[in-house]
Amino acid sequence: MSAVPMKAFLAGLFLLANAWHITAINEQHQKHHLQCWHCSSDTIGAEDFCDVTFQEDNIPTDLIKERNINLLRSCNGTINSDHERAVCRKTVEENNGKLITKRFCYYTNKSDPVELCNITSPEKNVRRIFCEDCLTDRCNGALAGASILEMLLLLPIAGLIQQFAI
């Protein structure tokens, strides 16, 4: 085999290997479904763990198993779109004078900013107090702004470490 056909053969083999690798990575990525908490503080028994502050330790695991309730949902399972994406959503709303916290899967346009849920209007006679979309597993159980608070608490410690290092 001469040098030119050998180079063409190797280049073709390289392209096929890359195409297979990209396909395998895409299939792996598509198999991962976003995991979101799914609960409402308005549900009897859920107020102990699904309130404004999510208390995973307060989830009544025996009751959940007995009634076959799944509080963690796979969100991407029903979506196959180039234009939509699954997000985990947490809302706090006032409905007829009662404060209700909900956590669930939601689908938005990929082009929409994550902050859009603060702008959209809820149902009639409902006043939205808080809304947050997030894109990582179980993120709708976290406190709003927890990462910012952690950063604010860590900054003075980082400053002290840097001061002693000099």
Swiss-Prot record:
Compartments reported by the entry: Cell membrane; Presynaptic cell membrane; Secreted
Extracellular compartment spans: 25-140
Annotated signal sequence range: 1-24
Membrane association type: Lipid-anchor; GPI-anchor
Source species, domain of life: Eukaryota
Keyword annotations from UniProtKB, A to Z: Cell membrane, Cell projection, Disulfide bond, Glycoprotein, GPI-anchor, Lipoprotein, Membrane, Secreted, Signal, Synapse, Transmembrane, Transmembrane helix
Primary location class: membrane
PTM annotation: GPI-anchored targeting the protein to the cell membrane.
Null mutant phenotype: Viable and fertile with no gross anatomical or behavioral abnormalities. No reduction in synaptic terminal size, number of active zones or number of synaptic boutons at the neuromuscular junction. Reduced frequency and amplitude of miniature excitatory junction potentials at the neuromuscular junction.
GO biological process: regulation of neurotransmitter secretion
Disulfide topology: C36-C88, C39-C50, C75-C105, C117-C131, C134-C139
Positions annotated as propeptide: 141-166
Lipid modification (GPI-anchor amidated asparagine), residues: N140
Transmembrane segments: 141-161
Glycosylation: residue positions: N76, N109, N118
GO cellular component: cell projection; extracellular region; plasma membrane; presynaptic membrane; side of membrane
Residue spans, topological domain Cytoplasmic: 162-166
PANTHER family in alphabetical order: ATILLA, ISOFORM B-RELATED-RELATED, LD40063P
Further facts: The name 'target of wit' comes from the observation that expression of this protein in certain regions of the central nervous system is dependent on the BMP signaling-pathway activated by the receptor protein serine/threonine kinase wit/wishful thinking.
Role, per record: May be involved in the exo-endocytic cycle of synaptic vesicles.
Name listed for the protein in its UniProt record: UPAR/Ly6 domain-containing protein twit
UniProt source species: Drosophila melanogaster
Gene that specifies this protein: twit
